[in-house]
Amino acid sequence: MERYESLFAQLKERKEGAFVPFVTLGDPGIEQSLKIIDTLIEAGADTLELGIPFSDPLADGPTIQNATLRAFAAGVTPAQCFEMLALIRQKHPTIPIGLLMYANLVFNKGIDEFYAQCEKVGVDSVLVADVPVEESAPFRQAALRHNVAPIFICPPNADDDLLRQIASYGRGYTYLLSRAGVTGAENRAALPLNHLVAKLKEYNAAPPLQGFGISAPDQVKAAIDAGAAGAISGSAIVKIIEQHINEPKKMLAALKAFVQPMKAATRS
């Protein structure tokens, strides 16, 4: 959890925002997935958001659903994902690692056991996409017991009550949603979210990272100009993996070429 705090402090000092890529663990196979993650970090990723393949990903659009299917086709299991996480942490000791997942995967292990395993492999945060704030107590309590930050989604239409709850229960960062709907680069991020950012700050929430529909450097810049601490890009990155599925070297080069200008856009 402390990795987020020290990262945001360092970025603030350097007058930068965070650029955060999302990929599904094990897409398109374990070996290439580890190379993809190394490439994202080398190209300038400040933190990682990683998905564990799940059979019914409700919040995800077709691009990320396909990533999940590719990981399943490669035979990737949650146990292997945790082995990958341990390897990533060993190689990259300081980068914050977040998981973005669904409640069933947490229940399968038992809630406490799941967060204990996260702590063991060096995961810093977990966002459970299908658990609303008001039902989050058993998840967030287990998370905090194991020094894992519980992450909450702040939708664009959040009312005052919800903003207060998110500020009170969330740690690490706040996932600020650009718009309603499912993930996807086709649907560009909507209006600047200045009013939400201001409210979250007022209630002392964890720093907001804007996600959903972030696929170009100008959107990263706009998110940071609106007061977000950074931006998360998922579908645009997963699309690059899809486009170069049969050319692993080209894939890594294309990912690097995408991430570098996205990171550059975080510098004021």
Swiss-Prot record:
Its EC number is 4.2.1.20. The keyword Repressor does not apply. Keywords: Amino-acid biosynthesis, Aromatic amino acid biosynthesis, Lyase, Tryptophan biosynthesis. GO terms for cellular component: cytosol. PANTHER family: TRYPTOPHAN SYNTHASE ALPHA CHAIN, CHLOROPLASTIC, TRYPTOPHAN SYNTHASE, ALPHA CHAIN. This is Tryptophan synthase alpha chain. Gene3D superfamilies: Aldolase class I. Pfam families: Trp_syntA. Pathway: Amino-acid biosynthesis; L-tryptophan biosynthesis; L-tryptophan from chorismate: step 5/5. Tetramer of two alpha and two beta chains. Belongs to the TrpA family. The active site is at 49 (proton acceptor), 60 (proton acceptor). It catalyses: (1S,2R)-1-C-(indol-3-yl)glycerol 3-phosphate + L-serine = D-glyceraldehyde 3-phosphate + L-tryptophan + H2O. GO terms for molecular function: tryptophan synthase activity. The alpha subunit is responsible for the aldol cleavage of indoleglycerol phosphate to indole and glyceraldehyde 3-phosphate.
